[in-house]
């Protein structure tokens, strides 16, 4: 990195431009390395997330799974509300401060933790006291366990809030492999194991939900240990925040509070609405469909958490061109990795839902609708991160509120008559509204192109290649599991064939050099645009 940023010996008029190009190359390599780690973790998380969905649906049936998913929805939405946007505030604030005993990063922790934990305690107490009234509506299908299940769910909110915030701090103070180990390995691997053990032991929904929550407590302890060293906790680091620490942090975080709740609870709002308006069986079907949709989104999530601190640094220094270059690169990665998943989910929805059980195949239309909507979500890239890391959380709030308004309005109209399919149509419309609005805002804020010709080529090639494979599978064996197997075989054969092309192999070599940090990769990739600092 030192060599990449050293001023050239013949720096003259071109010095600033060359420095900007070097900065862009360094940041592109850094994003490549972080992105790969995030993607590998997301792949493991997606696999075990699918295993968890199979365990819940097979172990508890449609009605029981509906109650289980509704309980997860309660804790997810409550946690998102109680964090008050502080997790994104940490991702924004910590990279701009100094770590260590003599640094000022540790002062952010009390600012970020105290208000959300107090909110979590209030919600836990209020939820437990009102469990008798809420359980029959929110957790229909859970029988006599409804009261205990909802009480346990609310009681866990402070723990999950603390875990969420410390995970954000961990991402900023340790290499990404530490975050991946906790968020993408510990949590997703432990949950299906413990929930499955509860189901096999006939422990019921209460035991199953306990199995889902225990890994959160383990992750909280792991995060505490991992963030203590870099922040200088217990070694004399200053923890008493100044008045400006409070005002600066919460001016950024509070507008994010509502949008964070909407982001985290977008699917779960649909599950809860479906449970109330259409019954637990439809909620179970919609929850199962949603698990597939969220699994496909993990590639984008892995990329987002990998580069958010990097975007915060770049945008904080006014280097918008470099930030846009990182965004464009990662959009291509996310598109190439996510679109095949969603296209296959749309075409072979029947095959995927058969894995949960025959009663879940009623969700085929819902799966198709949501899979197509997610092409929009992944196609625009992580525009939300550009807004948030650029300090424009208010604009992000506007886009998420627009999406939520569309989702809830259409849901109240469509769910009573169409069940899970109505919920999917409502959510799909909300997804498109939120992402297209955020993309427009991000383009205006960054002032740089967010879509390149390479992005369009990647989109066309992905749709064309997966479309051919899916068509062969459908014509050969239908839309069930045999057809899916044929389509996957054709895709694998196509990928192997692409590896024989010199241009493809050259592109892979460039990417691998970026991951290793080779300067040659920067030359192969070409110079980055000049900085737009102060534009």
Language-model features, listed with the residues they occupy:
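Hydrophobic alpha-helical transmembrane segments
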Residues: 151, 181-232, 252, 401-412, ...
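Signature of the first transmembrane helix
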Residues: 3-10, 14-19, 27-88, 115, ...
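Transmembrane helical elements of multi-pass membrane transporters/channels
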Residues: 33-50, 211-227, 240-313, 373, ...
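Membrane-proximal transmembrane or re-entrant/amphipathic helices at the cytosolic face
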Residues: 2-22, 471-535
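Interfacial segments at transmembrane-helix termini and the short loops linking adjacent helices
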Residues: 131-153, 328, 336, 345-375
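Interhelical loop/hinge segments that connect adjacent transmembrane helices in multipass membrane
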Residues: 2-31, 205-211, 223-267, 306, ...
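Membrane-interface junctions at transmembrane-helix termini in multi-pass inner-membrane proteins
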Residues: 159-183, 371-402, 444
């Amino acid at each position: 990195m030192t060599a990449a940023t050293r001023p050239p010996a013949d720096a003259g008029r071109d010095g600033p431009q060359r420095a900007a190009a070097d900065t862009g190359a360094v940041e592109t390599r850094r994003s490549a390395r972080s992105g790969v780690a995030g993607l590998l973790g997301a792949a493991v998380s997606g696999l075990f997330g699918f295993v968890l969905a199979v365990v819940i649906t097979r172990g508890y049936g449609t009605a029981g799974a509906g109650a289980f998913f509704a309980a997860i929805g309660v804790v997810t939405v409550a946690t998102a509300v109680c964090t008050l946007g502080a997790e994104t505030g940490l991702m924004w604030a910590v990279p701009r401060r100094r770590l260590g005993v003599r640094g000022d990063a540790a002062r952010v922790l009390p600012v970020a933790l105290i208000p959300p934990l107090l909110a979590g305690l209030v919600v836990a107490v209020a939820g437990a006291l009102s469990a008798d009234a809420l359980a029959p509506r929110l957790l229909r299908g859970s029988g006599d366990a409804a009261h205990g299940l909802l009480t346990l769910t609310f009681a866990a909110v402070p723990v999950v809030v603390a875990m969420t915030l410390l995970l954000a701090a961990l991402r900023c103070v340790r290499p990404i492999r530490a975050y991946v180990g906790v968020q993408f390995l510990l949590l997703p691997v432990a949950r299906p194991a413990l929930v499955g053990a509860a189901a096999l032991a006939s422990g019921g929904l209460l035991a199953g939900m306990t199995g889902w929550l225990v890994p959160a407590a383990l992750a909280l302890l792991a995060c505490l240990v991992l963030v203590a060293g870099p922040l200088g906790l217990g070694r004399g680091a200053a923890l008493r925040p100044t008045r400006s620490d409070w005002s600066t942090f919460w001016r950024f975080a509070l507008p994010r509070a509502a949008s964070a709740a909407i982001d985290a609870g977008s699917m779960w709002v649909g599950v809860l609405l479906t449970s109330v308006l259409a019954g637990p069986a439809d909620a179970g079907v919609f929850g199962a469909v949603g698990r597939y949709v969220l699994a496909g989104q993990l590639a984008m999530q892995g990329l987002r958490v990998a580069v958010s601190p990097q975007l915060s640094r770049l945008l904080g220094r006014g280097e918008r061109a470099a930030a846009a270059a990182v965004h464009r690169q990662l959009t291509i990665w996310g598109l190439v990795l996510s679109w095949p998943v969603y296209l296959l989910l749309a075409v072979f929805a029947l095959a995927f839902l058969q894995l949960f059980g025959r009663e879940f195949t009623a969700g085929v239309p819902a799966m198709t609708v949501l899979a197509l909507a997610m092409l929009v979500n992944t196609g625009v890239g992580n525009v939300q991160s550009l807004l948030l890391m650029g300090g424009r959380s208010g604009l992000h709030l506007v886009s998420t509120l627009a999406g939520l308004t569309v989702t809830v309005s259409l849901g109240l109209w469509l769910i009573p008559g169409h069940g899970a399919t109505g919920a999917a149509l409502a959510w799909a419309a909300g997804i498109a509204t939120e992402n297209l609005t955020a993309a427009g805002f991000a383009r205006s804020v960054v002032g740089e192109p967010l879509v390149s010709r390479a992005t369009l080529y990647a989109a066309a090639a992905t749709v064309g290649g997966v479309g051919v494979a899916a068509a062969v599978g459908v014509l050969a064996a239908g839309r069930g599991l045999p057809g899916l197997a044929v389509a996957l075989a054709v895709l694998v054969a196509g990928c192997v064939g692409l590896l024989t092309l010199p241009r493809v192999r050259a592109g892979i070599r460039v990417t691998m050099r970026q991951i290793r940090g080779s300067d040659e990769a920067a030359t192969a990739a070409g110079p980055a645009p000049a900085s737009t600092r102060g534009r």
